[in-house]
Protein backbone atom coordinates (compact mmCIF):
# COMPACT_ATOMS: atom_id res chain seq x y z
CA UNK A 1 0.00 0.00 0.00
CA UNK A 2 3.02 2.28 0.25
CA UNK A 3 2.78 3.35 -3.39
CA UNK A 4 -0.90 4.25 -3.05
CA UNK A 5 -0.21 6.09 0.22
CA UNK A 6 2.43 8.16 -1.58
CA UNK A 7 0.01 8.95 -4.41
CA UNK A 8 -2.71 10.00 -1.98
CA UNK A 9 -0.25 12.11 0.01
CA UNK A 10 0.91 13.90 -3.15
CA UNK A 11 -2.68 14.47 -4.25
CA UNK A 12 -3.57 15.93 -0.85
CA UNK A 13 -0.55 18.23 -1.03
CA UNK A 14 -1.82 19.47 -4.40
CA UNK A 15 -4.91 20.95 -2.72
CA UNK A 16 -3.12 23.88 -1.02
CA UNK A 17 -0.80 24.20 -4.01
CA UNK A 18 -3.80 24.88 -6.26
CA UNK A 19 -5.55 27.08 -3.70
CA UNK A 20 -8.41 24.67 -3.06
CA UNK A 21 -8.12 24.48 0.73
CA UNK A 22 -7.73 26.76 3.73
CA UNK A 23 -6.20 25.24 6.87
CA UNK A 24 -7.30 21.56 6.82
CA UNK A 25 -10.56 22.01 4.90
CA UNK A 26 -10.18 19.18 2.42
CA UNK A 27 -9.27 15.57 1.81
CA UNK A 28 -8.31 13.16 -0.96
CA UNK A 29 -8.66 9.39 -1.04
CA UNK A 30 -7.90 6.56 -3.44
CA UNK A 31 -9.00 2.93 -3.57
CA UNK A 32 -7.20 -0.35 -4.17
CA UNK A 33 -10.05 -2.33 -5.70
CA UNK A 34 -8.25 -5.68 -5.60
CA UNK A 35 -7.60 -5.45 -1.86
CA UNK A 36 -10.78 -3.60 -1.00
CA UNK A 37 -8.83 -0.92 0.85
CA UNK A 38 -9.00 2.88 0.77
CA UNK A 39 -6.20 5.33 1.60
CA UNK A 40 -7.37 8.71 2.89
CA UNK A 41 -6.00 11.83 4.58
CA UNK A 42 -5.97 11.80 8.38
CA UNK A 43 -8.50 14.03 10.10
CA UNK A 44 -7.38 17.54 11.02
CA UNK A 45 -3.66 17.08 10.33
CA UNK A 46 -1.99 20.21 8.96
CA UNK A 47 -0.63 20.01 5.43
CA UNK A 48 2.62 21.65 6.54
CA UNK A 49 3.56 18.71 8.74
CA UNK A 50 1.84 15.84 6.94
CA UNK A 51 3.86 12.91 5.53
CA UNK A 52 3.02 9.98 3.28
CA UNK A 53 3.20 7.62 6.25
CA UNK A 54 0.46 9.66 7.95
CA UNK A 55 -2.11 8.51 5.39
CA UNK A 56 -4.71 6.17 6.88
CA UNK A 57 -5.78 2.86 5.33
CA UNK A 58 -9.34 1.69 5.96
CA UNK A 59 -11.37 -1.26 4.73
CA UNK A 60 -14.73 -0.84 3.02
CA UNK A 61 -16.53 -0.81 6.36
CA UNK A 62 -14.37 2.10 7.55
CA UNK A 63 -12.25 0.08 9.95
CA UNK A 64 -8.67 1.37 10.22
CA UNK A 65 -6.24 -1.34 9.12
CA UNK A 66 -3.11 0.82 8.94
CA UNK A 67 -2.14 4.20 10.37
CA UNK A 68 -1.68 6.05 13.64
CA UNK A 69 -4.33 8.72 13.07
CA UNK A 70 -8.09 8.79 12.75
CA UNK A 71 -9.17 8.94 9.10
CA UNK A 72 -10.90 11.98 7.62
CA UNK A 73 -14.32 12.72 9.08
CA UNK A 74 -15.65 12.43 5.51
CA UNK A 75 -14.47 8.83 5.12
CA UNK A 76 -18.00 7.39 5.14
CA UNK A 77 -18.95 9.63 2.22
CA UNK A 78 -15.95 8.45 0.20
CA UNK A 79 -16.68 4.79 0.97
CA UNK A 80 -20.32 5.08 -0.04
CA UNK A 81 -19.32 6.52 -3.42
CA UNK A 82 -16.69 3.83 -3.99
CA UNK A 83 -19.25 1.13 -3.21
CA UNK A 84 -21.78 2.55 -5.66
CA UNK A 85 -19.48 3.50 -8.55
CA UNK A 86 -16.84 0.92 -9.58
CA UNK A 87 -15.30 3.35 -12.09
CA UNK A 88 -14.10 5.70 -9.34
CA UNK A 89 -10.46 5.45 -8.31
CA UNK A 90 -10.04 8.69 -6.37
CA UNK A 91 -12.26 11.21 -4.57
CA UNK A 92 -11.67 14.80 -3.39
CA UNK A 93 -13.64 17.00 -1.03
CA UNK A 94 -12.82 20.68 -0.54
CA UNK A 95 -14.44 23.94 0.47
CA UNK A 96 -12.97 25.88 -2.46
CA UNK A 97 -14.49 29.36 -2.57
CA UNK A 98 -16.48 29.55 -5.78
CA UNK A 99 -17.72 25.96 -5.94
CA UNK A 100 -18.77 26.23 -2.30
CA UNK A 101 -20.60 29.48 -3.05
CA UNK A 102 -22.76 27.64 -5.60
CA UNK A 103 -23.39 24.91 -3.01
CA UNK A 104 -24.45 27.49 -0.44
CA UNK A 105 -26.71 29.15 -3.00
CA UNK A 106 -28.29 25.75 -3.68
CA UNK A 107 -27.63 25.99 -7.41
CA UNK A 108 -26.06 23.74 -10.00
CA UNK A 109 -22.97 25.18 -11.69
CA UNK A 110 -24.28 25.91 -15.19
CA UNK A 111 -22.49 24.74 -18.31
CA UNK A 112 -21.88 28.05 -20.07
CA UNK A 113 -18.81 27.45 -22.21
CA UNK A 114 -16.27 25.08 -23.67
CA UNK A 115 -13.96 25.05 -20.65
CA UNK A 116 -16.79 23.47 -18.68
CA UNK A 117 -17.71 21.14 -21.55
CA UNK A 118 -14.16 19.81 -21.82
CA UNK A 119 -14.61 18.10 -18.44
CA UNK A 120 -18.27 18.04 -17.42
CA UNK A 121 -21.05 16.78 -19.69
CA UNK A 122 -23.75 19.17 -18.56
CA UNK A 123 -24.34 21.23 -15.45
CA UNK A 124 -22.51 20.26 -12.27
CA UNK A 125 -25.50 19.31 -10.12
CA UNK A 126 -26.37 20.47 -6.64
CA UNK A 127 -27.90 17.98 -4.23
CA UNK A 128 -30.99 18.56 -2.16
CA UNK A 129 -30.51 19.52 1.44
CA UNK A 130 -30.23 16.81 4.05
CA UNK A 131 -33.09 16.52 6.51
CA UNK A 132 -32.53 17.05 10.22
CA UNK A 133 -32.92 13.30 10.70
CA UNK A 134 -30.26 12.62 8.06
CA UNK A 135 -27.87 15.09 9.66
CA UNK A 136 -28.44 13.86 13.21
CA UNK A 137 -28.07 10.25 12.07
CA UNK A 138 -25.20 8.97 9.96
CA UNK A 139 -24.39 12.38 8.51
CA UNK A 140 -21.36 11.53 6.38
CA UNK A 141 -22.92 8.32 5.07
CA UNK A 142 -26.10 10.21 4.21
CA UNK A 143 -24.02 12.82 2.38
CA UNK A 144 -22.79 10.01 0.14
CA UNK A 145 -26.33 8.74 -0.30
CA UNK A 146 -27.67 12.15 -1.36
CA UNK A 147 -24.85 12.46 -3.91
CA UNK A 148 -25.83 9.07 -5.34
CA UNK A 149 -29.51 10.06 -5.30
CA UNK A 150 -28.69 13.18 -7.31
CA UNK A 151 -26.47 11.42 -9.86
CA UNK A 152 -28.88 8.55 -10.36
CA UNK A 153 -27.70 6.15 -13.04
CA UNK A 154 -25.47 8.68 -14.79
CA UNK A 155 -21.87 7.69 -15.53
CA UNK A 156 -19.99 9.56 -12.78
CA UNK A 157 -16.87 10.10 -14.90
CA UNK A 158 -18.98 12.08 -17.39
CA UNK A 159 -19.85 14.52 -14.61
CA UNK A 160 -16.90 14.08 -12.27
CA UNK A 161 -18.14 16.32 -9.51
CA UNK A 162 -21.09 17.68 -7.58
CA UNK A 163 -21.87 20.38 -5.04
CA UNK A 164 -23.62 19.29 -1.86
CA UNK A 165 -26.24 21.82 -0.77
CA UNK A 166 -24.99 24.16 1.98
CA UNK A 167 -21.77 22.15 2.23
CA UNK A 168 -19.33 22.12 -0.67
CA UNK A 169 -17.90 20.30 -3.68
CA UNK A 170 -16.91 16.68 -4.13
CA UNK A 171 -14.97 15.60 -7.22
CA UNK A 172 -13.70 12.24 -8.42
CA UNK A 173 -11.70 10.57 -11.14
CA UNK A 174 -9.87 7.46 -12.29
CA UNK A 175 -7.29 7.97 -9.52
CA UNK A 176 -6.39 10.50 -6.84
CA UNK A 177 -4.52 12.86 -9.16
CA UNK A 178 -7.31 12.78 -11.75
CA UNK A 179 -9.80 13.61 -9.00
CA UNK A 180 -7.73 16.62 -7.91
CA UNK A 181 -7.48 17.75 -11.53
CA UNK A 182 -11.28 17.67 -11.79
CA UNK A 183 -11.62 19.54 -8.48
CA UNK A 184 -9.37 22.30 -9.82
CA UNK A 185 -11.42 22.52 -13.01
CA UNK A 186 -14.65 22.61 -11.01
CA UNK A 187 -13.44 25.57 -8.99
CA UNK A 188 -12.35 27.40 -12.16
CA UNK A 189 -15.63 26.85 -14.04
CA UNK A 190 -17.58 27.81 -10.90
CA UNK A 191 -15.68 31.10 -10.90
CA UNK A 192 -16.21 31.58 -14.64
CA UNK A 193 -19.95 30.90 -14.34
CA UNK A 194 -20.32 33.40 -11.49
CA UNK A 195 -18.46 36.10 -13.44
CA UNK A 196 -20.30 35.37 -16.70
CA UNK A 197 -23.73 35.47 -15.04
CA UNK A 198 -22.72 38.69 -13.25
CA UNK A 199 -21.92 40.27 -16.62
CA UNK A 200 -25.02 38.86 -18.32
CA UNK A 201 -27.72 37.52 -15.96
CA UNK A 202 -29.74 36.28 -18.98
CA UNK A 203 -26.85 34.23 -20.35
CA UNK A 204 -27.97 30.93 -21.84
CA UNK A 205 -26.31 27.55 -21.45
CA UNK A 206 -23.75 26.43 -23.98
CA UNK A 207 -25.31 25.09 -27.19
CA UNK A 208 -25.76 21.32 -26.98
CA UNK A 209 -23.87 20.66 -30.21
CA UNK A 210 -20.85 22.60 -28.93
CA UNK A 211 -21.07 20.83 -25.58
CA UNK A 212 -21.13 17.45 -27.31
CA UNK A 213 -18.19 18.30 -29.55
CA UNK A 214 -15.92 19.47 -26.75
CA UNK A 215 -16.72 16.65 -24.36
CA UNK A 216 -16.57 13.87 -26.94
CA UNK A 217 -13.34 15.00 -28.56
CA UNK A 218 -11.66 14.47 -25.17
CA UNK A 219 -13.68 11.62 -23.67
CA UNK A 220 -15.68 9.92 -26.42
CA UNK A 221 -14.92 6.61 -28.17
CA UNK A 222 -13.24 8.48 -31.02
CA UNK A 223 -11.48 11.09 -28.87
CA UNK A 224 -8.64 12.88 -30.61
CA UNK A 225 -7.57 15.55 -28.10
CA UNK A 226 -3.98 15.24 -26.86
CA UNK A 227 -1.36 12.61 -27.63
CA UNK A 228 -1.75 8.85 -27.59
From Swiss-Prot:
Q: In which pathway does it act?
A: Cofactor degradation; L-ascorbate degradation; D-xylulose 5-phosphate from L-ascorbate: step 4/4
Residues in the active site?
Answer: 118 (proton donor/acceptor), 225 (proton donor/acceptor)
List the Gene Ontology MF annotations in alphabetical order. Answer: aldehyde-lyase activity; L-ribulose-phosphate 4-epimerase activity; zinc ion binding
Signal sequence segment = none
Could you tell me what induces this protein?
Induced by L-ascorbate. Repressed by UlaR.
Q: Which UniProt keywords apply?
A: Carbohydrate metabolism, Isomerase, Metal-binding, Zinc
Q: Does the keyword Ion transport apply?
A: no
- Cofactors (names): Zn(2+)
Task: Report the cofactor remark.
Answer: Binds 1 zinc ion per subunit.
Q: Name one GO cellular component term.
A: cytosol
Positions binding substrate in this chain are: 26-27, 43-44, 72-73
**Sites where the protein binds Zn(2+):** 74, 93, 95, 167
Reactions catalysed, semicolon-separated, are: L-ribulose 5-phosphate = D-xylulose 5-phosphate
**What does the entry give for GO biological process?**
L-ascorbic acid catabolic process; pentose catabolic process
Say if the entry is tagged with keyword Metal-binding: yes
Tree of life domain: Bacteria
Tell me the InterPro entries matching this sequence.
Aldolase_class_II_sugar_metab, Aldolase_II/adducin_N, Aldolase_II/adducin_N_sf, UlaF
One Pfam family linked to the record: Aldolase_II
Q: What is its EC number?
A: 5.1.3.4
Family annotation (HAMAP family):
UlaF (MF_01952)
What function is annotated for this protein?
Answer: Catalyzes the isomerization of L-ribulose 5-phosphate to D-xylulose 5-phosphate. Is involved in the anaerobic L-ascorbate utilization.
**Which family does the similarity line name?**
Belongs to the aldolase class II family. AraD/FucA subfamily.
Record protein name field: L-ribulose-5-phosphate 4-epimerase UlaF
Source organism per entry reads: Shigella flexneri
The root-end lineage is: Bacteria, Pseudomonadati, Pseudomonadota, Gammaproteobacteria, Enterobacterales
Amino acid sequence: MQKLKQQVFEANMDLPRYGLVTFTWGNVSAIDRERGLVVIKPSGVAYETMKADDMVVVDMSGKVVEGEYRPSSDTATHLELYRRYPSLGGIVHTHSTHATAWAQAGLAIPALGTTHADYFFGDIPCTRGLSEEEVQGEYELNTGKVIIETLGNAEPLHTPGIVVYQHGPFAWGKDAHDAVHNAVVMEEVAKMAWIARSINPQLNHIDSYLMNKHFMRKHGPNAYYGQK
